[in-house]
Amino acid sequence: MFRVAEFEKKGGRQVFKGFAVAGYRMGQRGQLKHYRKKIETKDRRKKNYVELNLATGQTDLKGKMIYEKDLVLDKEENQVCRVDFCKGYAAFVLIASLLDFEFPLSFLDKRNQKFEVVGNIYEGKKK
């Protein structure tokens, strides 16, 4: 399961447009297609593109699905972290920021239900 974040070119920049809800599928070789047309998944600044966010398979305190690139509030640490997939660990990790330094805070553990989704990197934190 994944969600698709759509971006469009505006004034030489790529701007987050929204999350697509239909029309995308994954081909047998892993290429993303919109109906029958293969679409761009890299930011080349000349045309619109999309990013895939994998679902973690876990829900937050309110039952909302947690995706890669979501911002979650860790209720125990009282800190907002970004959810990322770490290839080295082959797991989803929580990335915390301290000034300009980012570090893995902890693994996203299914037994640990202390997180609440408060936004994502595209739209920022919800108030």
Report the location of each language-model feature.
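Secondary-structure transition motif
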Residues: 1-127
